[in-house]
């Protein structure tokens, strides 16, 4: 099991991340995660590089390959609760 607080701890190490969502889905009875990050507006690191760094940090923390993709600043809703950041599909 991967707990939301553990994922948040990894993501919050990156000051370039303004907001994020974790999408949880099931394929062939296996749970899968995808992390969607919204970079800070005006950030100095390209979004693709940020996604790669986060993916490596998640792999290091959980020994799993979790896909990470970036979206444009202002795309994700502001989330004040974990339940709005974790989406089950």
Residue ranges, per PLM feature:
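AMP-binding/adenylate-forming catalytic core of the ANL superfamily
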Residues: 1-64, 81
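Conserved C-terminal "lid"/linker of ANL adenylate-forming enzymes
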Residues: 60-89
């Amino acid at each position: 099991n991967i707990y939301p607080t553990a994922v948040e701890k990894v993501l919050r190490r990156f000051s370039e991340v303004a907001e994020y969502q974790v999408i949880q889905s099931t394929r062939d009875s296996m749970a899968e995660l995808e992390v969607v990050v919204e970079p800070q507006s005006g950030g100095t690191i390209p979004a693709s590089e940020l996604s790669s760094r986060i993916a490596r940090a998640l792999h290091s923390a959980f020994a799993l390959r979790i896909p990470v993709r970036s979206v444009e600043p202002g795309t994700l809703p502001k989330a004040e609760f974990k339940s709005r950041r974790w989406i089950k599909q």
